[in-house]
């Protein structure tokens, strides 16, 4: 047999542009077919015709019997099988080299156009792009040719034809020789005078090689089927992804803007949801009446009027405003009727129709709290009037103040 090194180099170049399963298939082809065929099988079948003997002296009978027993030698049959199975891969390799060469020529033309341009017109000019902006790049991140588009179709046809050739050669080997060689072969072909017995050399060893090459062919067939399934499943997932997200491929192949990358590199903003805050509008009528009540005395700076809503009140906010308005009017009326003397405060607090209770703290300021007020709408409101006075003056002489505060007459007192 001839030298397989040239075919091996070509297939090695094709291995760089194949899938993982395709690389395994090429490894099986190299080791278990080409090497075994060149190293061992040729030695076994080297003496095939010379050792094929028949029990006849008729000239030409032995040759015609050998031709019927072996229409084609096993060695040549397997060599043809390797060549036919490798041909689709070589066609795919030619397509890859053609694409790479076209890409190189396109880059050379772009560089030549840039060199021909004048410096005024050529500065800052980008290389011309002849392809569509949506076309995927020729090479992937690792610098290998991307299997996509027309190249992917060529690769699929490559696998399909390899599978068909494998099936055809397995079937041909079965119909030509079977899977086992018998040591005795009977031949009755002309010009043999009668049925003659012919004997095959090394039948057992040849049978082992036949079974081995058949097993390798079946393994290659299984690898082809797995590769078709792998590519089909990958293409199906890609189609489903593009169907549900048609802009994914555009975003994947679209170059990113450096400014957008810098803007997006910061920490993501986090929005915290807060519970809704409801505010009840202030009643304008109450505020106006409180400040401009007719006949109301001027309030000191330390006087504060606070109106509290009852937590159990229900109804429309307008009703609350009406209740607050009536309560404020009653407070101002009672405040105007009371004399502005400290002595009358306890009596006025005790005789208040609303049951006010006077509270005095340690600092001397008085606190007055009113009871619940029932509005005409049947609602309850709590009005609290707070009077805050400045603390009493501190006496400079405690003894003098105690003497003057005593009510009994002393001998040293002057009579006026």
UniProtKB/Swiss-Prot annotation:
Q: Where is the sequence biased in composition, kind Low complexity? A: 342-353
Q: Where is the composition biased (Basic and acidic residues)?
A: 110-128
TM ranges are: 20-40, 72-92, 159-179, 208-228
Ranges in the Extracellular compartment? Answer: 41-71, 180-207
Q: Which GO terms describe its molecular function?
A: gap junction channel activity; gap junction hemi-channel activity; identical protein binding
Region entry Disordered: which residue ranges?
110-141, 336-416
Xref: SUPFAM superfamilies: Connexin43 (SSF118220)
Q: Name one GO biological process term.
A: cell-cell signaling
For membrane topology, the record states: Multi-pass membrane protein
Q: What cystine linkages occur within this chain?
A: 54-198, 61-192, 65-187
Q: Which GO terms describe its cellular component?
A: connexin complex; gap junction; plasma membrane
Q: Which UniProt keywords apply?
A: Cell junction, Cell membrane, Disulfide bond, Gap junction, Membrane, Transmembrane, Transmembrane helix
Tell me yes or no: is Transmembrane among this UniProt entry's keywords: yes
**Family from the record:** Belongs to the connexin family. Alpha-type (group II) subfamily.
Explain the purpose of this protein.
Structural component of lens fiber gap junctions. Gap junctions are dodecameric channels that connect the cytoplasm of adjoining cells. They are formed by the docking of two hexameric hemichannels, one from each cell membrane. Small molecules and ions diffuse from one cell to a neighboring cell via the central pore.
Subunit comment: A hemichannel or connexon is composed of a hexamer of connexins. A functional gap junction is formed by the apposition of two hemichannels. Forms heteromeric channels with GJA8.
**What protein does this entry describe?**
Gap junction alpha-3 protein
Q: Which organism is it from?
A: Rattus norvegicus (Rat)
